[in-house]
Swiss-Prot record:
Molecular function per GO: carbohydrate transmembrane transporter activity
Entry similarity comment: Belongs to the GRP transporter (TC 2.A.7.5) family.
GO CC entries: plasma membrane
Membrane topology qualifier: Multi-pass membrane protein
Protein name: Putative sugar uptake protein lp_2594
Protein location: Cell membrane
Keyword Transport among UniProt keywords: yes
CDD domains: GRP
Length: 282
């Protein structure tokens, strides 16, 4: 059952680039819709569960920082979809996130404690990084300058922060969920309105609430799985989203493979899947 919970974020995160690409708005529209959608999901879960608030102000603030950091990471992905394409952004983003979250989980939280677990974990990381490298470069065959990669490189730290904070605070996952979503709502909507004051008038802004709702569901399920199987395992399983998003970029958003053969892409995705399965079995 916990594996099913852990795989839901991968499905939601994988589908979202396709939805965002089909809506075809701007980064401001996407951030606005994401913030509203996440806030709506948080409110629904909160009303239905009616949890008693027992967390301290410090814990509440840390959870908000976690959500705000995630919004920064997602902004980098939205920008990179246009600069690099979905099918190139997602494999690179996966590898970047993996390195950071793995180091955090192992060094800060003592995960993969035994020698065998460390060997299997290292093997899983190698498979996923190799798979991401093989799968990348599938956008249109044109070379990209380093500046096109900067938004993704600079904002990935947001995902690292988001993934580790739930492990720092020993409270019920539902207690963290609302403040996390509030952090996303404030940063995402605030950034969108700051850069485009009339963003709320755009049709694409409200269409992007659907991806935002799916992100909210994924975030809730991620918190549950991270507390059960570890932040590293939960996050790596979530990176199966790269399989869904890369294929959707190629076949539904019509991004081209350029000189890289489809065999290389398929092999890379297989490596990623094998790495995620290996991690789940540690």
């Amino acid at each position: 059952m916990i594996f099913l919970i852990a795989i839901i974020p991968a499905l939601c995160w994988g589908i979202n680039p396709l939805l965002v690409g089909k809506i075809n708005g701007h980064s401001e529209n996407e951030m606005f819709g994401m913030g509203i959608g996440d806030g709506l999901i948080a409110l629904i879960f909160w009303l239905f569960s009616q949890p008693t608030v027992t967390i301290s102000g410090v814990t509440f603030g840390l959870a908000m920082i976690s959500g705000a950091a995630w919004a920064i990471g997602q902004l980098g992905q939205y920008i990179s979809y246009r600069l690099l394409g979905v099918s190139k952004t997602m494999p690179i983003s996966t590898a970047l996130q993996l390195v950071g979250t793995s180091l955090i989980g192992v060094l800060m939280f003592g995960e993969w404690g035994s020698s065998n677990q460390k060997i299997l974990g290292l093997l899983a990381i190698m498979l996923i990084v190799a798979g991401s490298a093989l799968s990348a470069g599938t956008s249109d065959g044109r070379k990209k300058g380093f500046s096109c990669y900067l938004p993704l490189l600079m904002t990935t730290i947001g995902y690292w922060i988001y993934s580790c904070i739930p492990k720092l605070v020993k409270v019920d996952a539902l207690q963290l969920f609302l403040p996390q979503m509030l952090g996303i709502l404030i940063v995402a909507v605030g950034w969108a309105i700051y850069h485009q004051p009339t963003v709320y008038r755009d049709k694409q802004s409200w269409q992007n609430t659907l991806p935002g709702i799916l992100y909210g569901i994924a975030a809730f399920m991620y918190i549950l799985s991270a507390r059960s199987i570890g932040v590293t395992n939960a996050y790596i399983i979530g990176q199966l989203s790269v399989v869904i998003s890369t294929l959707s970029g190629l076949f539904f958003l019509h991004e081209r493979t350029g000189q890289q053969s489809i065999v290389s892409v398929a092999t890379g995705l297989l490596f990623i899947f094998m790495g995620c399965v290996t991690t789940a079995l540690i």
